[in-house]
Design a protein with these regions (language model features):
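Short, solvent-exposed loop/turn segments at secondary-structure junctions
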Residues: 57-61, 168-169, 201-203, 224, ...
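Conserved core segment of the aminotransferase class I/II
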Residues: 96, 107-110, 117, 140, ...
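Conserved glycine-rich beta-strand-loop-beta hairpin in the small C-terminal domain of fold type I
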Residues: 424-455, 459, 468-511, 518-525
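Conserved core of the PLP fold type I
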Residues: 78-282, 286, 292-339, 534-535, ...
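Internal, charge-rich low-complexity segments
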Residues: 70-95, 223-233, 292-316, 393-418, ...
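PLP-dependent enzyme catalytic core of the Aspartate aminotransferase-like
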Residues: 135, 520, 546-552, 557-638
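N-terminal "arm"/small-domain region of PLP-dependent enzymes with the aminotransferase-like
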Residues: 2-133, 544
């Protein structure tokens, strides 16, 4: 039994929750050397009432050119939710008659509020601030995380949070925290850090990890997510690690709800198995969850209906011991954090898919010792997310939190209200947590309805049906003038309806294409190109961008974790995003895709494919798009 397992057993024998493990042996050399910023340490003294601050290099807030920050924002009821469980009706009310109306939010110049966690004003939010985040927003995120999202984390004291500039920033800081730079030819191979992930992975992670010299180590995955047992599964990779190839990986990256690109939702059972192996081999789990609220409870049922299959057996989401207070949040598959007895989970959240990517705002949830290190990293890198965004999001989710009707905040609201219609005046407030959850439910509803529509169209076009006169040998009466027809069904692609997220992950059956393995003459000097999987897959992507199809999808090779995956499997897949196009274009885009694929299978001239491949840039990607192309790949790297 290794040290980590024995620690855990001893602690779990007691009744009280165990303290999280000390994971400082995983810190990078840079992290170990990071000291608190002397200036940021002094910030707490800035808050002393009446203090005249001559210490900080702060510009005077009177000279900020913004007197208020204001926005017309959606009401939480703008979108109609979908049911939390198949066959139910939505728990929240559907959209009200004025759901399209906006609410008006105002961040005033100076709020008359002594509690920094309630004071939302231009004077503080546009000033230098705390590295952990703007106090009102940080305290709301902390409360939402600890009370509503991760109310059951099994270690003593529960997790803490720190704000980031989005999940990309969160992962970059995680690498800074845990990974020492490794350079080939300079450092010893046995020191090379490794990152465990699925064979198909959100591309940006690779772009972030590889320049640090990190070796990306893939773990076999199946339709239910990362495999634990069997050859190539997690246990096999870690137990049989060959140290001559690098250090045994101490870090895992995964997306468990609506995986990008595969759309898988990892079950709690699988999470428990993965967690146990990570605990045994002392691996830190980075759970990146931008799609957390987009879990589609109807997907399995609708998939069976669309395919004429028997209804699936109803699955129940394991319940937390303590309710979040919101049936919608309770209905989501629990996070790795709910199993995290050791404190080895670092979870990345973002406002990118729930508010807007341009916010560049998110947060990290982890055990407090790790959060403290992240704060130190924030201090000397981004310092804090943008004040404009922190101010507007604070106002949006916290609403009119300052008490009394004569506060500057209220006065600013009243002044504005005079100019607006009575209906808008009535809607003059922020959302609060219940409004935030209602917003999330509505988003899930809109995306779930889109995925159902798109997948039905994709199902209908998945097989090419052709008819031809049956061969003479198979006819019962060869002399009859009525030739019976032979029907051929050619599978073009197969897919599983996504259980969450924003993507459909299609497996193409290019081996059924008439030009599969055909020789394609290139230049007189070079040998002919063979139209294999990678060539046909690339040609199909370009073909779809031409008239009359005009759709852009992302190919699996873009998400392949390494060259081996790219060569063996990457070309078999295409990722289709059903989120980016306007509602009215979802059916059109799916229909054009289906038609484009079907017509591609009718191409029998190698010259057509050769020309399509000539359109690709040196990187193998489409360089210029025709006007009017609907993007189902959007953005390719996201
Ligand atoms: C899995 C995953 N992580 C992170 C991101 C980016 O998040 P952020 O905008 O917060 O950096 C994306 C965006 O597509 C994503 O799919």
């Amino acid at each position: 039994m290794d040290t980590f397992t024995s620690h855990r057993r001893v602690r779990l024998g007691r009744r009280e929750k165990p303290a999280p493990l000390d994971l400082s042996h995983h810190y990078s050399a840079v992290t170990k050397r990071r000291m608190p910023s002397k200036i940021k340490e002094a910030y707490k003294f800035f808050q002393i009432p009446g203090i005249l601050n001559m210490a900080g290099g702060l510009p005077n807030a009177d000279f900020f050119p913004f007197d208020t920050l204001e926005a017309q924002a959606a009401k939480p009821e703008r979108w109609t939710p979908s049911p939390n469980h198949p066959g139910e009706t939505a728990t929240s009310s559907t959209s009200s008659s004025d759901s399209a109306a906006a609410t008006h939010i105002v961040v005033p110049k100076a709020a008359d509020e002594s509690d920094p966690s309630k004071k939302i004003d231009v004077t503080t939010v546009l000033q230098y601030g705390l590295a952990a985040g703007y106090p009102p927003l940080l305290s709301w995120v902390r409360q939402f995380t600890r009370e509503n999202l991760q109310q059951d984390t099994p270690y003593k004291g529960g997790p803490d949070v720190v704000l980031t500039c989005g999940s990309t920033d969160g992962f970059s800081k995680t690498l800074d925290l845990l990974v020492d730079q490794w350079t080939e030819g300079v450092n010893d191979i046995t020191d090379r850090p490794g990152l465990l992930c699925e064979p198909f992975v959100y591309t940006n992670i690779l772009n972030q990890a590889q320049p640090h010299g990190v070796q990306v180590v893939t773990v076999k995955s199946n339709a239910s997510g990362m495999a634990v047992k069997g050859p190539g599964g997690l246990e096999d990779v870690l137990a049989n690690w060959d140290p001559s190839k690098g250090k045994r990986p101490h870090l895992m990256y995964t997306v468990t709800l609506g995986h990008n690109p595969t759309g898988i939702v990892l079950s709690v059972e699988r999470k428990k198995e993965i967690y146990a192996v990570c605990s045994k081999y002392d691996v830190i789990i980075v759970e990146d969850e931008p799609y957390w609220y987009l879990q589609f409870p109807s997907a399995a049922v609708e998939e069976a209906k669309s395919r004429g299959l028997p209804p699936p057996t109803a699955s129940t989401t394991p319940k937390s011991a303590r309710s979040s207070g919101y049936p919608f949040l309770d209905s989501l598959t629990p996070s790795f954090l709910s199993l995290d007895t050791d404190g080895r989970v670092i979870r990345l959240d973002t406002f990118s898919k729930t508010v807007a990517p341009g916010c560049r705002l998110g947060w990290i949830t982890a055990q407090p010792a790790l959060v403290e290190r992240f704060e130190r990293i924030n201090e000397s890198t981004t310092q804090q997310p943008s004040g404009f965004v922190q101010g507007l999001i604070s106002e949006l989710v916290l609403g009119s939190n300052s008490s009394g009707s004569n506060t500057p905040n209220q006065r600013a609201r009243s002044a504005f209200a005079l100019l607006r219609s009575p209906r808008e005046r009535a809607a003059f407030t922020g959302w609060d947590t219940s409004g935030w959850v209602r917003w999330l439910e509505g988003l899930r509803g809109t995306y779930e309805r889109r995925v159902v529509r798109m997948c039905r169209t994709l199902d209908a076009g998945a097989t090419l049906i052709t008819t031809a006169p049956a061969p003479l040998s198979s006819r019962s009466d060869p002399d009859s003038e009525w030739a019976p027809l032979a029907v051929t069904k050619t599978p073009l692609y197969t897919f599983r309806w996504p259980r969450g997220g924003m993507f459909v992950w299609l497996r193409l059956h290019l081996e059924t294409h008439p030009l599969w393995q055909a020789a394609c003459p290139s230049s007189p000097q070079s040998p002919p190109l063979v139209l294999d999987g990678p060539a046909l897959s690339a040609a199909l992507m370009v073909w779809l961008t031409t008239k009359p199809f005009l759709v852009l999808v992302a190919t699996g090779s873009m998400f392949s974790a390494n060259d081996e995956v790219r060569q063996e499997d990457g070309w078999r897949y295409q990722r289709i995003c059903f989120a980016a196009e306007e509602e009215g274009n979802v059916d059109l885009a799916a229909e054009r895709f289906v038609e484009g694929v079907r017509r591609f299978w009718e191409v029998t001239d190698v010259e057509v494919v050769r020309k399509l491949l000539g359109e690709l840039g040196p990187s193998g990607e489409v360089e210029a798009l025709e006007e009017g192309v609907s993007s189902l790949g959007w953005y390719m790297g996201c």
